[in-house]
């Protein structure tokens, strides 16, 4: 009788237990981790992120709030790139602070209490600290510490640096060239972009494909847009946009393009008034001169004046006569 070999031997009577043991031995151990399991790679990724953010700079800001603060105390926190942020609120009161609580909010939404919060009480001073990492634009916004039922608060406005342009409208004339300028004080944007506004949206300006525009800047924190051969339709709104690691900031500039007839309009109006006044004076002179040279008109005027004089004299002469008659009758 032939002996069974290979798998046939394993499935023969008496060997089912051995087969199960072999299958269990070849099955991967869950404790060792599955390379396709996201939890298997989460730990190294987190360690890499922590190592990446460990070298970030620290931005620390403080706000002092008292029980007499009727309005929110605000502080601007300007960030160009990812940073560690430490926000601290110090509340001072004259009464006991044992029952005083503090709540942190972002854009008026309560933040979850984690190990990043630290609140201490000492005497009549309550100090609350919130420390976290800002690494994207979604973390920008308003962070507020709210104290007690009266909701006395201090607010930190976290945002990227602001670009600044000319506040007043820039006036230029048809055919000329003009320069629009934007500056970012104490900051270095990664990139500058110019846009022209129309009725519906902002249109990017491509200086490489259109010789009408020249974009340059002598420093990294400023940008200049030169527009050549101006037309009236070139007037309108222009935006300069500064790009940072954490977001963007833009500023609006207004350009007014006038034709050369526009400055002459006030002078033309004055000239029209002068011409009208001279015409009226000439008409008066002509009428007066014509009146002097017309003798018939003068005679008629004299006759009318003579008749008026005679009528008045006749009335005056009749009155004394009536008085004499009355005296004779008596």
UniProtKB/Swiss-Prot annotation:
One of its GO terms (cellular component) is plasma membrane. Coiled coil: none annotated. InterPro entries: Ig-like_dom (IPR007110), Ig-like_dom_sf (IPR036179), Ig-like_fold (IPR013783), Ig_I-set (IPR013098), Ig_sub (IPR003599). Only member of the immunoglobulin superfamily to be expressed in embryonal carcinoma cells, which resemble multipotential cells of early embryos. It is found in: Cell membrane; Synapse. Residues 293-330 are annotated as: Disordered. The chain crosses the membrane at residues 255-283. Residues 293-311 have a biased composition (Basic and acidic residues). Its main location: membrane. Keywords: Cell membrane, Disulfide bond, Glycoprotein, Immunoglobulin domain, Membrane, Phosphoprotein, Repeat, Signal, Synapse, Transmembrane, Transmembrane helix. Induction: Regulated by muscle activity. Strongly up-regulated after muscle denervation, including that of gastrocnemius muscle. Maximal expression is observed 10 days after denervation (at protein level). The modification Phosphoserine is found at residue 312. Residues 38-161, 162-256 form the Ig-like V-type domain. Residues 284-330 are cytoplasmic. Glycans are attached at residues 55, 62, 70, 101, 118, 191, 198, 216, 221. SUPFAM superfamilies: Immunoglobulin (SSF48726). Residues 1-33 form the signal peptide. The keyword Membrane applies. It is a single-pass type I membrane protein. Plays a role in targeting the monocarboxylate transporters SLC16A1, SLC16A6 and SLC16A7 to the cell membrane. Plays a role in the outgrowth of motoneurons and in the formation of neuromuscular junctions. Following muscle denervation, promotes nerve terminal sprouting and the formation of additional acetylcholine receptor clusters at synaptic sites without affecting terminal Schwann cell number or morphology. Delays the retraction of terminal sprouts following re-innervation of denervated endplates. PANTHER family: BASIGIN RELATED, EMBIGIN. This is Embigin. It comes from Mus musculus. The lineage of its organism: Eukaryota, Metazoa, Chordata, Craniata, Vertebrata.
